Amino acid sequence: MDNKKRLAYAIIRFLHDQLRHGELSSDAQESLEVAIQCLETAFGVTVEDSDLALPQTLPEIFEAAAAGKELPPDLRSPQETPPSEEDSAEAERLKTEGNEQMKVENFEAAVHFYGKAIELNPANAVYFCNRAAAYSKLGNYAGAVQDCERAICIDPSYSKAYGRMGLALSSLNKHTEAVAYYRKALELDPDNETYKSNLKVAELRLREAPSPTGGVGSFDIAGLLNNPSFMSMASNLMNNPQVQQLMSGMISGGHNPLGTPGTSPSQNDLASLIQAGQQFAQQMQQQNPELIEQLRSQIRSRTPSASNDDQQE
C-alpha cells in the first residue's frame, strides 16, 4: 500500500483529533478544516479510510522517536517473522483466559491477558479487537478506538473490528464516524442484524443532534413549535372551555371551580390536568400519527446494542 497515503491519513487523523480536543480558537479551527480539505483532495484520502491506519497514531510515533525509545510491542507494526509455535500457543492460551475473564465481568483482568497475548503475537487482529471490547466495558472508549484501529490495520476485512469501532465512537458521541464504521462492518457482513440495528441508532442520533435552539438533550423544541399540526392541536386544546376554566382556577390561587366535595383543589387540578393531557394526546394520535412517532423517537433514549459483539473469539 502507498506509504504516502498512509502518512497523509495519519496527518488527517491527527488534525481531526485536534479539531475535537485541541481547544482551538474559531479561526484556528477554520484553518485546520481548510488544511484537512486540501490534504484529502491532494492525496485522495479521507478520515473514513480506516484501512490506511497504522498500528500507532502520529503522536505516538513522534513521542517514541523524540525519546529515542523503541515502541512497545503492542504499538509496533506487525512482525514480518511469525511467532514461534510455542509463543502462538501461549498467546492463544492467554486469549482464552481473557475470554473467561470477560464472561465473569472481570474486565481489567481481561485487558491484562489480552495485552500479554499481544506481546507474544502482535500480528493477531483478534487479540486487539478482544481487548477493545474489554476497554469499552471499562469505559475506556479511546483505548477501544485505538485497538480497533490496530486490528483493522492488521486485517482490513475484519468486520467485528469495524463494528466495535462503531460502538466505541458512538459512546464518544462521534456519530458521523460511527455511521461510517457500521456501514463498513455491514459491507463485510451484510446479514449481521446487530450492525444493522446499531447503524440505525447511530443515524438517528446523528439526525437528532441538538440544534442551537433545541431543548434539553436531543429534544428539538424549536422544531416542534414550528410544526403546524402540533400548533393547531395545541391551539384547540387551549381554547377548550374546560382547560381554560382549569387554568383560570390555578392562576387565581388554587381555587378549582371543578372541585367536588371531599376532594382538595390540588387533587382536582392534577386529575383535570391529566385528563386534558390525555385528550390532547388522543387527538394528536388520531390526527397526526406521524408526529406522534416522531416525538416518540426524540424522547426515546436508545443505545447501540453490543449483544453480537459480546462474543469473544
UniProtKB/Swiss-Prot annotation:
Any one GO BP annotation for this protein: negative regulation of ERAD pathway
GO molecular-function term, one example from the UniProt record: molecular adaptor activity
A Pfam family of this chain: TPR_1
Biological role: Co-chaperone that binds misfolded and hydrophobic patches-containing client proteins in the cytosol. Mediates their targeting to the endoplasmic reticulum but also regulates their sorting to the proteasome when targeting fails. Functions in tail-anchored/type II transmembrane proteins membrane insertion constituting with ASNA1 and the BAG6 complex a targeting module. Functions upstream of the BAG6 complex and ASNA1, binding more rapidly the transmembrane domain of newly synthesized proteins.
Family in the record: Belongs to the SGT family.
SUPFAM superfamilies, per the entry: TPR-like
Protein's name according to its UniProt entry: Small glutamine-rich tetratricopeptide repeat-containing protein alpha
Main location: cytoplasm
Domain of life: Eukaryota
Region ranges (Disordered): 69-97
Gene name as annotated: SGTA
Modified residue annotations for Phosphothreonine: 81, 303
First and last residue of the signal peptide: none
Cellular component terms per the entry's GO annotation: membrane; nucleus; TRC complex
Modified residues annotated as N6-acetyllysine in this record: 137
Subunit structure, interactors included: Homodimer. Homooligomer. Interacts with DNAJC5 and DNAJC5B. Interacts (via TPR repeats) with HSP90AA1. Interacts (via Gln-rich region) with SLC2A1. Interacts with HSP90AB1. Interacts (via TPR repeats) with HSPA8/Hsc70; the interaction is direct. Interacts with BAG6 (via ubiquitin-like domain); interaction prevents interaction between BAG6 and RNF126. Forms a multiprotein complex, at least composed of DNAJB12, DNAJB14, HSPA8/Hsc70 and SGTA; interaction with DNAJB14 and HSPA8/Hsc70 is direct.
Localization (cell): Cytoplasm; Nucleus
Positions where Phosphoserine occurs in the chain: 77, 84, 301, 305
InterPro entries per record: SGT, SGTA_dimer, TPR-like_helical_dom_sf, TPR_rpt
SMART domains linked to this entry: TPR
Gene source species: Bos taurus
Keywords, sorted A to Z: Acetylation, Chaperone, Cytoplasm, Nucleus, Phosphoprotein, Repeat, TPR repeat
Each TPR repeat, start to end: 91-124, 125-158, 159-192
